[in-house]
Swiss-Prot record:
Record-given protein name: 3-dehydroquinate synthase
Lineage: Bacteria, Pseudomonadati, Pseudomonadota, Alphaproteobacteria, Hyphomicrobiales
Top-level taxon of the source organism: Bacteria
Species: Mesorhizobium japonicum (strain LMG 29417 / CECT 9101 / MAFF 303099)
Role: Catalyzes the conversion of 3-deoxy-D-arabino-heptulosonate 7-phosphate (DAHP) to dehydroquinate (DHQ).
UniProt xrefs under HAMAP family: DHQ_synthase
GO BP terms in the entry: amino acid biosynthetic process; aromatic amino acid family biosynthetic process; chorismate biosynthetic process
Pathway membership, UniProt: Metabolic intermediate biosynthesis; chorismate biosynthesis; chorismate from D-erythrose 4-phosphate and phosphoenolpyruvate: step 2/7
UniProt keywords, alphabetically: Amino-acid biosynthesis, Aromatic amino acid biosynthesis, Cobalt, Cytoplasm, Lyase, Metal-binding, NAD, Nucleotide-binding, Zinc
Amino acid sequence: MSADQPVTVEVGLGDRAYDILIGSGLLSRAGEEISRRLPGTRAAVVTDENVAAAHLDTLKAGLEKGGIQPTVITMPPGEKTKSFAHLEEVVDGILAARLERGDVVIALGGGVIGDLTGFSAGIVRRGMNFVQVPTSLLAQVDSSVGGKTGINSPRGKNLVGVFLQPKLVLADTEVLDTLPIREFRAGYAELAKYGLIDRPELFAWLEANWQKVFAGGPERAQAIAEACRAKADVVARDEFETGDRALLNLGHTFGHALEAATQYDGARLVHGEGVAIGMALAHRFSSRLNLASPDDAARVETHLRAVGLPWRMADIPGELPDAEALLAFITQDKKVSRGALTFILTRGIGQAFIAKDVPASEVLSFLRENHPTSRKAG
């Protein structure tokens, strides 16, 4: 795949439709691609210290080629940046640059920067133009697509935010070459998720080709494009998560609870790792409820283990709160409706479904059985 021929995936949302461009060298073309869609705009780039060191100069040069001289707002890296304090800092930076409603706010970074920047763009001047330039695999296949933005609260993950669709997503596959292997693995969990939801052929392809995806080349771009198509299809059907879009939360109810339980400490657990454990638990829980075969849960666990991802609570360093405390985090999750527990469960690989009114007693028993302190865990 050359810089001249990126793959284009359209997110079909009527007059708010936008393109995801996937290919090599897109940072150098950012100004051209943005100016074509948003002529005459000024810009602020929000990034973090690590991404800035690796990619900011390339993006700035690409923007300047398109006539855009950006203001740069740099944040510390890590999940704890998704906070009210850092939201205020980004908002103030945008206002200090005297950007107007028709100007553009660009997120250069992973999921944290994308979520924080999108929320900022959504509330400054009651909504500004927003462009995603995701630099992690997780952001390229998941968080940069679909318009969810937000920050964390001490009471839970992503509880404060808005929907704001970007005008454009530029997924430059070159930037993934600088990604630490742990971060790449974390993003891979979200990629595999699409196969587990409703594309069993994708999961089977990943089982056979995951090493090529990790190595780079055409298989990596192919996998990213397939994941983006899967998410774009769901978002076009259900933009505001009133129905099918909830399927994209496979693994996230357990995963978010584990992230909250570790106080969003990235040294212990990053988001994609939480999703990996959550997906394994969702399949195991489905098996426990006699909804799916234990063989499917074992297949998911085997694949996660093969790529080097955690797949059980015992893989998280340090002590976890007890099962009752984990259940309390789950009940705080957004996927709770009027106190009833809602989970994304499965009838098999690629057969995820929304399960409402899941008994809390069943969840608690399952958490006790799978807690690292239980002899049954593992």
